[in-house]
């Protein structure tokens, strides 16, 4: 895999490999290092993968050679091109195409997800490259965002065929390899598979990543990730169209035989929305049979001949696919002719489709004579035009090589083993052209390249152009850098006052080979254009319909303030929301309106590494056993607490720490977060619905419009919440008053009356306390309350004045708290027999009832079920069948009129209610009849 991370550190001269000057390091591995090099003849930047063969075993060495063999077979505009293979006794040098804009993984991490139109164009390029490989019986088996590179024009380049292999139709493969988040379920299960179906699954994951900016299958550990892949369940965000969802679901099918084929993907409705137009191939690719000399680019061959390179040896190298210095120079010159036409040594730049072979030869010979001039004619450009005449015997003596701990870098000492042919000159470095193109600067994601007829450009250049102010304005914002645009279109754009038409397109695959190269080193930093709107945004703003193509569109300088707002709007649009829901589309309800966008991108993830033997994941997990389980169980309570009390951003941060902890315990796994946080939050939504609703942390930016059905559901939820709150308050009140359900004996239980000879007054503590719990109907009260009107429905239940205390006394308060749906209490048990001479004591029953008296007396006789103790003076006034009664205050007693027998059933059918006495600031409870 070729990487383009970080700034390159220029090292002119000291380190060389063959014709290449090493300018920096792109990446390092265990047994290899990737260097950024520049060919001294063609001035083309390349990526050089230096492999230490002495550190590889036979299996890995065979894998390297197979990768080289596959790359030699492939020649596609969206596949990294192999230029040269150099091999010594212990080292192997692979010179490949250099993708300047790096991985699309990093692009998504920095810029967010792609819109579906742009993702479709990228996916068409990926699909064409994979179809090309499958047509040559080659399967990649490691398609992922890290292996999809972006060239100067933001076009896709597939890299890293390390897991690639050959396949035959109908034969199954049995090497279970790949990157876990992109691997198909049959790989995890250890089943034999067909290669193309494996790539189809990986392409489905890649398409999901392009559109959503996150992975469909993810997990903190490899076994969890494996389980989710085998389940085949993933979330669809609200911003994804139904056609795109249908395509992804048809690609991510667990049964390999039911997945879409490449031909079916090309015919899918979502893909047909925007189909790239195939332009004529200017430089036809080599056929399977041996090409003749006429099938090679004559212009490049003549130029090589002018540089002193034997044309016959070059043709033989190309026919034999030797990939030596001759072939490398030819490939690099062809590539420069395609991409850097502005700096290619041609006297008059004409459209390649209009040139004749004889014209090519004449122009090449004429220009080659000027290229071969001595370097001394151009003293200021000594560095650009320096001679590359390389004496093979004095290369090592001319330079001193720095020492390094990396054996791959130390292998540069073996330069004398790499034979280089004699070359008499070199080309100029690619420089921006003299003529200025009128264009609009834009983000790299929507870079476009103007393709203008060469004849239109020559007229009116000297006249005053009003659009120069627009050009100067854009130049100041980009640091005096001018950028051409990498996409060619069939739309015409007219610059104001210039009278020139620009042909532009939304499809990066239609890149014109006649467009000028003016990217330079500006594309190394993808963030310098963030505040400027794309040309496509301006075009769409002036069109009434997205599908409408207007032949004349005027462009004006944009306001910097509006550009900043446009940039913020675009960045907000590219962020994926956090509340995906499984099993349904989030856009089906209004709950997704105003969702706070999350800041979770691929930059928070560790890059996935391809591994072998993915089918042994479960076995490895069982062997780890106790090491993995505590990690998984320890995360659950932490996430439960976070989901109800912490903001979403803190949840994301803490879950990242949990994921990193898991990764430290399992270093061989690939800890990735992405949708893992969303997945865990979704799993916690159902059990924590009520705490989430009461959480002060806002989840939505604004109140969404509520439908009638939602309002009804919220009303029911509110009623249920109030019921639960009142029930909890009632239980707390019972516990406070020392009333427990276990203290009420059942109807079949009877309590004996023990003898109590000691006075009850000596047993009472200074403050009120009960040795036995009272029933909910009668409870002690510390204050005297007046008669309340709510008792008027019981006319016979009148209060009597207390004999020892002046003033009336209200009945003791009930403990209930406005309870709804309260069940009536069970009937009380019959009173136990009592000995006549025994002193009465407090009893314990379910509920206090009003018993009928045995005699018709004006003073009621209280049954033995009462358990209010009184003093000795009051006890003498009661018969032996009466029970002493206490209200919590000494020397006080209360008497009640008995209830009629016909009123008892109604009493038991009542429920408890409460009323507030405003005079005493107390709560009085009673039984209210149900209606």
Curated annotation (Swiss-Prot):
Give the gene symbol. Answer: Sik2
One GO term of the biological process aspect:
negative regulation of lipid biosynthetic process
Query: Which residues does the record give as ATP binding sites?
Result: 26-34, 49
Phosphoserine PTM sites in chain numbering? 358, 532, 534, 587
Domain UBA intervals = 295-335
What is annotated about its quaternary structure and interactions?
Answer: Interacts with and phosphorylates TORC2/CRTC2. Interacts (when phosphorylated at Ser-343, Ser-358, Thr-484 and/or Ser-587) with 14-3-3 proteins; the interaction inhibits its kinase activity towards TORCs. There is a cooperative effect of the phosphorylation sites in 14-3-3 binding as the interaction is stronger when more sites are modified.
Its recorded name reads Serine/threonine-protein kinase SIK2
According to its UniProt record, in which tissues is this protein expressed? Present in both white and brown adipose tissues with levels increasing during adipocyte differentiation. Lower levels observed in the testis.
What UniProt notes about the protein's domains is: The RK-rich region is required for cAMP responsiveness.
Main localization (coarse): cytoplasm
- Purpose: Serine/threonine-protein kinase that plays a role in many biological processes such as fatty acid oxidation, autophagy, immune response or glucose metabolism. Phosphorylates 'Ser-794' of IRS1 in insulin-stimulated adipocytes, potentially modulating the efficiency of insulin signal transduction. Inhibits CREB activity by phosphorylating and repressing TORCs, the CREB-specific coactivators. Phosphorylates EP300 and thus inhibits its histone acetyltransferase activity. In turn, regulates the DNA-binding ability of several transcription factors such as PPARA or MLXIPL.
Q: Which InterPro entries match?
A: Kinase-like_dom_sf (IPR011009), Prot_kinase_dom (IPR000719), Protein_kinase_ATP_BS (IPR017441), Ser/Thr_kinase_AS (IPR008271), Ser/Thr_kinase_SIK1/2 (IPR017090), SIK (IPR034672), UBA (IPR015940)
Known regulation of its activity is:
Activated by phosphorylation on Thr-175. Inhibited by phosphorylation at Ser-343, Ser-358, Thr-484 and/or Ser-587, probably by PKA, which triggers interaction with 14-3-3 proteins.
């Amino acid at each position: 895999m070729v990487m383009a991370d970080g700034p390159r550190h220029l090292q002119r001269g000291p380190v060389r490999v063959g014709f290449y000057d090493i300018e920096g390091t792109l990446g390092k591995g265990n047994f290899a290092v990737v260097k950024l090099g520049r060919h001294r003849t063609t001035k083309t930047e390349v990526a050089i993968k230096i492999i230490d063969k002495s550190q590889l075993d036979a299996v890995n060495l065979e894998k390297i050679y197979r990768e080289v063999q596959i790359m030699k077979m492939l020649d596609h505009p969206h596949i990294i091109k192999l230029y040269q293979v150099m091999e010594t006794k212990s080292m192997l040098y692979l010179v490949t195409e250099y993708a300047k804009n790096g991985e699309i993984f990093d692009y998504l991490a920095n810029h967010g997800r792609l819109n579906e139109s742009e993702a479709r164009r990228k996916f068409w390029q990926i699909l064409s490259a994979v179809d090309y490989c499958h047509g040559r019986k080659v399967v990649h088996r490691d398609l992922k965002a890290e292996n999809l590179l972006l060239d100067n024009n933001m076009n896709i380049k597939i890299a890293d065929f390390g897991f690639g292999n050959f396949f035959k139709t109908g034969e199954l493969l049995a090497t279970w390899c790949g990157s876990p988040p992109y691997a198909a379920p049959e790989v995890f299960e250890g089943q034999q598979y067909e290669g193309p179906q494996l790539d189809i699954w990986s392409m489905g994951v890649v398409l999901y990543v392009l559109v959503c900016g996150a992975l469909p299958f993810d997990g903190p550990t490899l076994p969890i990730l494996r389980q989710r892949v085998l389940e085949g369940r993933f979330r669809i965000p609200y911003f994804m169209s139904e056609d795109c969802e249908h395509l992804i679901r048809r690609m991510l099918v667990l049964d390999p035989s039911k997945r879409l084929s490449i031909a079916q993907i090309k015919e899918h409705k979502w893909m047909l929305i925007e189909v790239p137009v195939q332009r004529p191939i200017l430089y036809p690719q080599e056929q399977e049979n041996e090409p003749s000399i006429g099938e090679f680019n004559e212009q490049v061959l003549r130029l090589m001949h002018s540089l002193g390179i034997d044309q016959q040896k070059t043709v033989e190298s190309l026919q034999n696919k030797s990939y030596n210095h001759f072939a490398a120079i030819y490939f690099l010159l062809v590539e420069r002719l395609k991409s850097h036409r502005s700096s290619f040594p041609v006297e008059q730049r004409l459209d390649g489709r209009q040139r004749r072979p004889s014209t090519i030869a004449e122009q090449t010979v004429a220009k080659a004579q000027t290229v071969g001039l001595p370097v001394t004619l151009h003293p200021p450009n000594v560095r650009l035009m320096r001679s590359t005449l390389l004496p093979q015997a004095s290369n090592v003596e001319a330079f001193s090589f720095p020492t390094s701990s990396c054996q791959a870098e130390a292998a540069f000492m073996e330069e004398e083993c790499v034979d280089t042919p004699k070359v008499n000159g070199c080309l100029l470095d690619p420089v921006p052209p003299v003529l200025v193109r009128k264009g609009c600067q834009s983000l790299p994601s929507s870079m476009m390249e103007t393709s203008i007829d060469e004849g239109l450009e020559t007229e009116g250049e000297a006249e005053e152009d009003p659009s120069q102010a627009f050009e100067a304005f854009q130049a100041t914002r980009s640091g005096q850098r001018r950028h051409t645009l990498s996409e060619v279109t069939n739309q015409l754009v007219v610059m104001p006052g210039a009278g020139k038409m620009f042909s532009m397109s939304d499809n990066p695959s239609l890149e014109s080979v006649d467009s000028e190269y003016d990217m330079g080193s500006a594309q190394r930093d993808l963030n310098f254009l963030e505040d400027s709107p794309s040309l496509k945004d301006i075009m769409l703003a002036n069109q009434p319909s997205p599908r409408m193509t207007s032949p004349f569109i005027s462009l004006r300088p944009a306001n910097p303030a509006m550009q900043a707002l446009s940039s913020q709007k675009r960045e907000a649009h590219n962020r994926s929301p956090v509340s995906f829901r499984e099993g349904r589309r989030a856009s089906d309800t209004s709950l997704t309106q105003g969702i706070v966008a999350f800041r979770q991108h691929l930059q928070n993830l560790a890059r996935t590494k391809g591994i072998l033997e993915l089918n042994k994941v479960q076995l490895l997990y069982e062997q780890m056993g106790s090491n993995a389980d505590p990690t998984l169980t320890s995360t659950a309570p932490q996430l439960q607490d976070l989901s109800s009390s912490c903001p979403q951003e803190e949840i994301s941060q803490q879950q990242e720490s949990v994921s990193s902890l898991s990764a430290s315990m399992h270093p061989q796994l690939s800890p990735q977060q992405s949708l893992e946080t969303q997945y865990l939050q979704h799993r916690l939504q159902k059990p924590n619905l009520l705490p989430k609703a009461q959480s002060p942390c806002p989840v939505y930016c604004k109140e969404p419009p509520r439908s009638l059905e939602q309002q009804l559901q919220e009303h029911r939820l509110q009623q249920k919440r109030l019921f639960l709150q009142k029930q909890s308050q009632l239980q707390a009140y019972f516990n406070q008053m020392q009333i427990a359900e276990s203290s009420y004996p059942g109807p079949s239980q009877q309590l004996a009356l023990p003898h109590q000879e000691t006075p009850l007054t000596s047993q009472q503590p200074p403050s009120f306390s009960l040795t036995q719990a009272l029933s909910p109907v009668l409870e002690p009260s510390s204050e005297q309350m007046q008669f309340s009107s709510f008792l008027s429905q019981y006319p016979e239940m009148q209060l009597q004045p207390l004999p020892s205390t002046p003033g009336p006394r209200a009945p003791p308060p009930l403990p209930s708290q406005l309870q709804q749906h309260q069940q009536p209490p069970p009937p009380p048990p019959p009173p136990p027999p009592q000995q006549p001479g025994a002193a009465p004591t407090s009893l314990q029953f379910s509920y206090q009832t009003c018993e009928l008296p045995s005699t018709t007396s004006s003073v009621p006789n209280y049954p033995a079920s009462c358990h209010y103790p009184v003093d000795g003076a009051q006890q003498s006034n009661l018969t032996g069948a009466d029970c002493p009664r206490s209200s919590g205050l000494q020397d006080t007693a209360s008497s009640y009129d008995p209830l009629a027998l016909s009123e008892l059933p109604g009493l038991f059918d009542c429920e408890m209610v409460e009323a507030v006495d405003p005079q005493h600031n107390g709560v009085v409870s009673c039984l209210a009849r149900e209606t």
